[in-house]
Amino acid sequence: KVLCGLEIGTRPTPPESLPRATENFDYVLFECLDDTRAIDFYEFLEWRKLFKCKAGLAHTDIFKLGERYGLDIIKILRDNDIFWELNTSGNYIYYYDFLTNEKKQQIIKESGIPVSVGSDTHYIAEYRKKQIRRANELLQKLNIPLP
């Protein structure tokens, strides 16, 4: 099955035309919301409501994001039907942290939040099959749903 999606940068605030431009997409991924240069999280939550397709957070340490805003980020993601992307590119510490932190794994498992696995593969030499397989196997083992 082939899906159509778009990864949307949030540094700076994205264009207002995107919700309409993505009406027929299967999903959108908003990236780097844990970055201090990103769109304000409260503003993001309002803006996300304009999108008709599924939405996820990419390149984002959701635990760090929750701490930054003093929020129960898991509840907010669940209540707003937002999934999380676990990115295996090797550029994000949160990926390795999640793979080795059983407490965080249990939090996500118990929350029921869907998790996707991304790779940031732009050409075949970047394809990290082992990491993608490992992340997917962990999600299956924990019965964490896909989006």
Question: Where are the regions that the model predicts?
Answer:
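Conserved beta-strand edge residues that scaffold enzyme active sites
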Residues: 9, 90-91, 122
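Extended substrate/RNA-proximal surfaces in nucleic-acid metabolism proteins
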Residues: 1-82, 140-144
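General beta-strand structural signal in soluble alpha/beta enzymes
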Residues: 2-4, 86, 117
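Short acidic/histidine-rich active-site segments
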Residues: 113-127
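Short secondary-structure boundary segments
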Residues: 32, 86-89, 119-120
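C-terminal domain-boundary segment and adjacent tail
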Residues: 122-124, 141-147
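His/Asp/Glu-enriched short active-site or ligand-binding loop at hydrolase and phosphoryl-transfer sites
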Residues: 81-94
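Histidine/acidic-residue-rich catalytic or RNA/ligand-binding cores of hydrolases
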Residues: 66-74, 94-108, 124-139
